[in-house]
Amino acid sequence: DVMSYGLDTKVETIGRKIAGKIPPLGHQAYNIAVVPVMMQPLRYKVNVELDCVDENGNPYKFHRENMEYALFAICNASYYGGGFCPAPGSKLDDGLLDFTYVDPLSLAKAVPIVPRYSAGTAAEYAPDVVHTGYTVGGRFWSVDDRPLLGNCDGENFDYTEVRFKVEKH
């Protein structure tokens, strides 16, 4: 399960259209969709508040208003889309959601990161722009009261605010 905003949501939207028109492409449609999306500015804005946990289990808050980003993914799985891997160490049963966000970047900086994002090694390759962590809940909300285009498990949504949390059963 992955909820995402930004670049990857746009890739998913275009990839689904390509796959609908050319079904034999299958998941390769998402790899093809990366090209037109990368030709657009890779800069979006959102307000974010996350209840996070560091690697030692200590809680902390991640709060940014008017945050600029290229991609933001909240993950309870390692892979999504056409095999992209934003959270290589994600575990379904650990009570945590992994998150990955990428700062705004130029096309020249983005091009070498994309295959590494697909392989799950982007954070190691570009730690100055690819950031990761763990969360148990939080919210995303619009900076201008317009709906945010997001995606959850292949389904697009557009809300001005989204809240989420991990519930143990």
Regions from the PLM with identified roles:
Residues 1-169:
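Long C-terminal subdomains/extensions of small-metabolite kinases
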